[in-house]
Amino acid sequence: MTASTATETLLHKGSGLQVVVGLGQSGLSVAHYLAEQGYQVAVTDNQENPALADKLPATIDIRQFGAIDAELLQQAARIIISPGISLDNDAIAAARAANIPVVSDIQLFCEACTVPIVAITGSNAKSTVTTLVGQMAADAGINVGVGGNIGVPALSLLSNDKMELAVIELSSFQLETVTNLGAQVATVLNMSPDHLDRHGDMLGYHQAKHRIFQGAKSVVINREDALTRPLVSDSLPRLSTGIHAPNKGHYGLITDAAGQTYLARGTERLISADKLKIKGRHNLLNAQAALALGELAGLPLESMLSTLQQFAGLEHRCQYVATIAGIDYFNDSKGTNIGSTMAAVEGLGAVYAPKDGKLLLILGGQGKAQQFGELSPFINQYVSQVLFIGEDSQQIEQHLRAAGLSDEVSLHQCQTLENAFSMIEQVTASSLSQVQAVLLSPACASFDQFNGFVARGERFSQLVKQLNTVSQQALS
């Protein structure tokens, strides 16, 4: 349909038009939801032939593809923007200047949802904690919907009329247009620089993330990260998490005289860290966050601990792949920012440090204008070898060196994962090698060499398996 035809159609159909901008999975869910509610709906997308266009309801006949139609947006009663579309887009900015409401699918969801919402955001670990809380709820016998920025679009959860609890992961892109989410419990797990190309600076990023607390009935706070603390009433119910012994009623870690670490609630030891399948100090924080969120959502503690003990984590998130010649291999391809990589290096590094072991870290890709020098202290403490891949590898090395990287850390420019594995064989063959674990945690986007972090992680795992085969043949 041409722009002129679209305008004529609007004149005939009248006002109240809902315009969906962006036809990804969330945009498609919005289009279906609004059409089912009886709204007049139009869809516009930058792509000439969006892959999901043939899945739109037949009742939506206003479809403007190839560019976001500024004229169409000016006719809207409300615009529902997909997470991948920036508010700075010229057509969107013009619509906002004309006082046309611009919201996300999450705004529609929270307005329509009649069950308690557990809302989770953060720079890292969102998917892990969201999945874990969802599993805890399901294992406790609750009919739970899990979605948002993970898997199922939030609006699609509403089709389950038996749903008793919604657990949703939210990105900063989804939150920047949300008002008064009204969650039963909300949390910002952690904050580190990410998506600054979209939000402008840390202030803009922080403001977007903290919209999750609007209207919340209770909150969970990470004591180790001041940027997660919301500006809410002191009377609002809250629980906190951290790496040290907690105050009464809160979550933390207790280490006994023998050096054994336990998840704890107040002075009560809940479970030994050794009994968990997910490893690393960062995952102990994730486990605490899930327990705290679950408690404030009304889940029973014993059931949550049982689920936690069985939880093996998610693919591409500090995922154990194999042990070859005594060296453990971990796939953290989802580590696409420096905060995530800091957590992975510190979390796993602390596991191997007592045995005088070091990590070999594979780093690089598209750097997203991050300050990689912030990684240097963590690398100095836990890493003996850094292998760089991807288009920004030279710049990342320069950042690390300028930030006081230790001379004891060896750096290798490898460009590709394949070259990195050739270097791994050389490095680990040395009798002087301290490497006890190889960690892919790139701190970068993957689109310079792969079609996403999943493809990058899968390639890493393939190369590990190939290396294992070679190792087995050498032993036979």
Curated annotation (Swiss-Prot):
ATP binds at G122, S123, N124, A125, K126, S127, T128. One of its GO terms (molecular function) is ATP binding. GO terms for biological process: cell division; cell wall organization; peptidoglycan biosynthetic process; regulation of cell shape. Keywords: ATP-binding, Cell cycle, Cell division, Cell shape, Cell wall biogenesis/degradation, Cytoplasm, Ligase, Nucleotide-binding, Peptidoglycan synthesis. Its EC number is 6.3.2.9. Gene3D superfamilies: Mur ligase, C-terminal domain, Mur-like, catalytic domain, NAD(P)-binding Rossmann-like Domain. Pathway: Cell wall biogenesis; peptidoglycan biosynthesis. Disulfide bonds: none annotated. It is found in: Cytoplasm. It catalyses: UDP-N-acetyl-alpha-D-muramoyl-L-alanine + D-glutamate + ATP = UDP-N-acetyl-alpha-D-muramoyl-L-alanyl-D-glutamate + ADP + phosphate + H(+). This is UDP-N-acetylmuramoylalanine--D-glutamate ligase. Pfam families: Mur_ligase_C, Mur_ligase_M, MurD-like_N. Cell wall formation. Catalyzes the addition of glutamate to the nucleotide precursor UDP-N-acetylmuramoyl-L-alanine (UMA). Its main location: cytoplasm. GO terms for cellular component: cytoplasm. The gene is murD. Belongs to the MurCDEF family. InterPro entries: Mur-like_cat_sf, Mur_ligase_C, Mur_ligase_C_dom_sf, Mur_ligase_cen, MurD.
